[in-house]
Design a protein with these regions (language model features):
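Conserved, structured C-terminal
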Residues: 3-212
Length: 215
């Protein structure tokens, strides 16, 4: 059984580099790359990706090494300003970055282009030996016809109001969509939400929109 941990933030490379001889530079390990690291007595699978929009790595290793690696990281953490964080901290950072949450912001019923994730599909790329990717025709059709809804990110001006999900999104007093997720953006100083809005195919600007406050 594997245990997963993560080191995230601007000092994450320096901290992790102090624990291994593997070169963690951007040139050697670019974004999304994976490698095995020797950290003390453990072999760790390191994936250079995070859910917070910052430099960082997700670490996978046998669960019997979980306490050992946690204590090893904690023993050197102070000089790198290491702090423990929980899921609410991660959720706050990811929504500021507009990272979608599967199950709230995207599901298997949403179109990749409506979700603003067109960069992850390459319809112009030469097909592999297995043929075109699943959903190729749907992407081409949407590209030709345009999106009728799209994900947008919202920041509340009032810093005292929270967003959760399902709040209506209004433009000129009319509901044009609902928030799919929300959290407080501590770096931005206000609640942040992601939500789908209705739009005309080819429409690129929505003007000023707002989220209706609860209560």
């Amino acid at each position: 059984m594997l245990f997963r941990s993560a080191i995230m933030g601007p000092n994450s490379r320096e901290l992790l580099q102090s624990l291994t001889d593997t070169d963690l530079s951007n040139e050697n390990l670019p974004f999304t790359s994976v490698c095995n690291l020797e950290i003390g007595m453990a072999t760790v699978r390191a994936h250079r990706i995070t859910y917070v929009g910052e430099l960082g790595w997700e670490l996978y290793f046998p669960i019997e090494f979980s306490n050992y690696i946690a204590e090893l990281i904690e023993s050197i953490g102070e000089k790198f300003s290491l702090k423990l964080c929980g899921m609410h901290s991660v959720d706050s950072c990811r929504i500021e970055k507009a990272y979608r949450h599967f199950g709230h912001d995207i599901t298997d019923e949403d179109h990749v282009l409506d979700a603003g994730l067109g960069f992850v599909v390459k319809p112009d790329k030469k097909p592999s030996k297995y043929g075109k990717f699943i959903g190729y025709d749907a992407v081409r059709k949407k590209q030709a016809n345009g999106c009728e809804k799209r994900v947008m990110q919202f920041l509340l001006i009032n810093p005292d109001v929270m967003l959760y999900h399902n709040e209506p999104i209004l433009r000129n007093g009319e509901i044009i969509g609902y928030l799919s997720s929300g959290a407080y953006g501590h770096t931005l100083g206000g609640a942040v939400g992601l939500g789908y809005i209705d739009c005309e195919p080819g429409e690129s600007e929505i003007g000023r929109a707002s989220c209706r406050e609860r209560g």
